[in-house]
């Protein structure tokens, strides 16, 4: 864990090192992913069956790769009632928030008599990638599927690996809640390829969303342009801005809630109180002694964690904007005032009773957020990822006579004679 102080000599260099330190894994998966995608594109279902046997130790004919409605219902029925209630609560809140995001169409006539508009229409088909096995996350199903449903996407196809044939009941229950009926027991880059290019079994989709390992992320990168994708997700990250009035144990737990995700995850505390910084560091050490995922969390905290002592909240805001974190917790008396200074963050959690874990499950806004400082230019997943804009222009003869001459002049200036003629011939009639 790195300790930085903005009043110390060399802070700028140390902070630059902190920004550059993460995500330097040199292991390239580009070539094996490229080979898998080419194979799926060439051999289709046969390749899917081969990779499923190889990576998931599951040998099935192509027609059995789709999970039947009976299997989905049977697995979902195994979920305890309290967990189903929790899924329903999360689904209700996620759906409500994303429904409020839906934009309205635009239609007006301007001062030249030209009718202008903009229509929003949903994508036809979306592919959902869901990690499988023991590390399956039903919350990710809700966060990816529900915005698509709210947006009006008619077809949702989901791919989830089932190592050794084991299905995850919670994942299937979440899919059932979202109305996802087309589910395949396929994972990895091969699943991304199947959804992007299509096979006899799986019709191609228009956009692929959902988290995955390095192979899945690279596959999404390589199929982008053929289909849309949500983002290339990096390791999770949180920045906690806290004053000395906080319980150091709560701050420690919030930091470790990110650290336990992945050895590459990053958790950073920013505070104006140097004494509190020490108490928080000690609290992290104590929690790591009993945390079930202590090996992962300890590695993350040791390699990528940081505590930064600042001279003012204004300075804290500058650092947050430079970090552009995926998650920002503001544990201050006036969290809204501080948040007003923040330009770059995927999601902001305000107040001492709003840990980032609220947003992971039951807050309502999406937990699929920009990582690796991409919050400088990107946003979290929303209904806008599943709809697109089409602009409309309607002009009658009178309207064209008002604006057409300017168009003719510009077309001639660009040397595009047919463009100019398509306007001028209409203007010369009558």
Swiss-Prot record:
Leader sequence segment: none
Record keywords, A-Z: Amino-acid biosynthesis, Histidine biosynthesis, Metal-binding, NAD, Oxidoreductase, Zinc
Catalytic residue list: 326 (proton acceptor), 327 (proton acceptor)
Cofactor: Zn(2+)
Gene3D superfamilies in UniProt: 1.20.5.1300, Nitrogenase molybdenum iron protein domain
Family: Belongs to the histidinol dehydrogenase family.
Name assigned to this protein: Histidinol dehydrogenase
Organism: Gluconobacter oxydans (strain 621H)
Gene that this polypeptide is encoded by: hisD
């Amino acid at each position: 864990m790195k300790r930085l102080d903005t009043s110390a000599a060399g802070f700028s260099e140390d902070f630059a090192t902190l920004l550059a330190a993460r995500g330097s894994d040199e292991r390239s998966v580009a070539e094996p992913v490229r080979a898998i995608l080419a194979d799926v594109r060439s051999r289709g279902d046969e390749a899917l069956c081969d990779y499923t046997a190889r990576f998931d130790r599951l040998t099935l004919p192509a027609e059995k790769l789709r999970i039947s409605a009976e299997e989905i219902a049977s697995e979902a029925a195994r979920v305890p009632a309290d967990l189903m209630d929790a899924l329903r609560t999360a689904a209700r809140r996620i759906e409500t928030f994303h429904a409020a995001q839906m934009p309205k169409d635009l239609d007006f006539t301007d001062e030249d008599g030209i009718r202008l508009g903009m229509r929003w229409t949903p994508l036809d088909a979306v592919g959902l990638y869901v990690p499988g096995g023991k590390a399956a996350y039903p919350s990710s199903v809700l966060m990816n599927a529900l915005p698509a449903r709210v947006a009006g996407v008619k077809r949702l196809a989901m791919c989830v690996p089932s190592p050794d044939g084991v299905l995850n009941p919670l994942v299937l229950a979440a899919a059932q809640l979202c109305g996802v009926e087309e589910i395949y027991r396929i994972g990895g880059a091969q699943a991304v390829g199947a959804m992007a290019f299509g096979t006899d079994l799986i019709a191609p989709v228009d956009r692929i969303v959902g988290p995955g390992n390095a192979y899945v992320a690279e596959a999404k990168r390589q199929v982008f342009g053929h289909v849309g994708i949500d983002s290339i997700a990096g390791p999770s990250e949180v920045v906690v801005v806290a004053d000395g009035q906080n319980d150091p144990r709560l701050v420690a737990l919030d930091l470790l809630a990110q650290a336990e995700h992945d050895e590459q995850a990053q958790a950073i505390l920013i505070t104006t109180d140097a004494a509190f910084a020490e108490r928080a560091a000690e609290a992290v050490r104590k929690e790591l002694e009993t945390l079930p995922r202590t090996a992962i969390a300890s590695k993350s905290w040791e390699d990528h964690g940081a505590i930064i002592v600042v001279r003012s909240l204004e300075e804290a805001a500058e650092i947050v904007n430079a970090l552009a974190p995926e998650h920002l917790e503001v544990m201050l008396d006036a969290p809204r005032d501080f948040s007003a200074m923040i330009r770059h963050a995927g999601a902001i959690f305000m107040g001492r009773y709003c840990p980032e874990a609220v947003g992971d499950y039951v807050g309502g806004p999406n937990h699929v957020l920009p990582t690796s400082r991409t919050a400088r230019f990107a946003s979290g997943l929303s209904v806008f990822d599943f709809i697109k804009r089409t602009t409309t222009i309607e002009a009658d003869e009178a309207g064209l006579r008002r604006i057409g001459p300017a168009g003719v002049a510009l077309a001639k200036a660009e040397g595009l004679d047919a463009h100019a003629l398509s306007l001028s011939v209409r203007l010369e009639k009558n």
